[in-house]
Amino acid sequence: MTTRCVMVLGTTSGAGKSWLTAALCRWYARQGLKVAPFKAQNMSNNARVVGGGEIGSAQYFQALAARAVPDVRMNPLLLKPERDTHSQVVLMGQVSAELTAMPWRGRSERVWPQIAQALDALRAENDVVVIEGAGSPAEINLMASDIVNLRVARHADARCLLVTDIDRGGAFAHLYGTWALMPESDRALLRGFVLNKFRGDASLLAPAPQQLQALTGIATVATLPMWREHGLPEEDGVFDDRSHASGAVTRTVAVVAYPRISNLDEFQPLKNVPGVRLAWARTPAELAGADWIVLPGSKHTSGDLAWLRAQGLDRAIAAHAARGGAVLGVCGGLQMLGEALVDPHGIDGNAPGLGLLPLVTVFEREKTVRHRAAVFGQLGGAWASLSNVPVAGYEIHHGQTAIHPQMAQDGHAVMPEGLAWQNARGNVLGLYLHGLFEDAAALHALFGAAAPTLDATFDGLADFIDNHFEAGVLQGLIA
């Protein structure tokens, strides 16, 4: 068959593009087709390690949904925000210092040939490419430099769905306004409107879908009910701030939500572990009652550490640890738990650590990006159940961490090559490996239970859209 490209555009960020793209990937894969996802440019601090470097987490999961091997071509340009006005640029999996220093308008034309080449290569190798847009295609101030929405749609001759979040209100205005602001020649690419996150009786929407079709010539092809527990992380850049619990709560895990939090998607499985309540904390009050406090990854470790101190969270974490409460630091969180952050190259900034682990971290120019599998050594205290447990995960960091030479008695390595450290008391654990809570063996060791498998999650997504799209629409998009 001729390769078809199906594209998911959205009226806003957070409309549901990422999970709908994953659902489409699995739906088409279940038809026996060879499928790949694609997103030209992603802005996210949620990244995964693949062959050749790193890509946005959303495209990583979409590839798994498509039963494909994740590939840097699926997300050729990744922007990782470090400050409000500055992002690290990752091109084809590798950090580019040149592009990072370049104004974004000039950057767009520079990278477009590689984006087009990556997309063309995926089209040549697959039956279907499911493309995700970014934000809205009707941002008229950005159209001249667009490399992720309509320019991609035109290049791929994609059949596009436009999805909107009806729960926000104003969905029909969003759909009509987006259509109206699109260049007339591009409107022909739209094959259907999708209403996402609907609550209530869908018949009450009439006659709005029919009126919208009369105005635009485009039918509403799906009304998707609100479904919070679909099992995938929220769209990149959208922070799911609710706490989650599966069943009666026996343990509360509070993750500190600093401004430049990264790889927060690795905590997604905790939402579905029986007895575990996952909460996000920005204030000392939100840490109260936590059994475990987790300091996650950070794209700006010293800056997030300063923010943490300004909120008084440092004192709350120290008090929790002093009471014997369990504390876990992952990557940037591990670095914060140490004695000092040393930055000789101006990468992240110098800062004193929280002093809960006897470690010193030096930020190096070279970035470590790799898959890792390792085995915990003998642990004590709150983390004893992880003793001798194998864990598979990934590393993404500039820091290199070692024991403070004068404090060796206060802690020790509990994984080869300095991948994990524990304090002498046994209640504070630092880990460079991302993915602890995604590892089945680790989940079982920590909780005696496991979250649903990703494969079951993807099949659930495919079943959901199969039930709620108008008959024949999904097949018609690739006919």
From Swiss-Prot:
Pfam families listed in its UniProt record: CbiA, GATase_3
Protein's name in the database: Cobyric acid synthase
One BP annotation, GO: cobalamin biosynthetic process
Positions annotated as active site in the UniProt record: 331 (nucleophile), 434
Classification via PROSITE patterns: GATASE_COBBQ
Ranges where the GATase cobBQ-type domain occurs: 250-442
Species: Variovorax paradoxus (strain S110)
Similarity comment: Belongs to the CobB/CobQ family. CobQ subfamily.
HAMAP family xrefs: CobQ (MF_00028)
Alphabetized UniProt keyword annotations: Cobalamin biosynthesis, Glutamine amidotransferase
Lineage, opening ranks: Bacteria, Pseudomonadati, Pseudomonadota, Betaproteobacteria, Burkholderiales
Molecular function via GO: ABC-type vitamin B12 transporter activity; catalytic activity
Annotated metabolic or biological route of this protein: Cofactor biosynthesis; adenosylcobalamin biosynthesis
Role: Catalyzes amidations at positions B, D, E, and G on adenosylcobyrinic A,C-diamide. NH(2) groups are provided by glutamine, and one molecule of ATP is hydrogenolyzed for each amidation.
Gene3D superfamilies tied to this protein: 3.40.50.880, P-loop containing nucleotide triphosphate hydrolases (3.40.50.300)
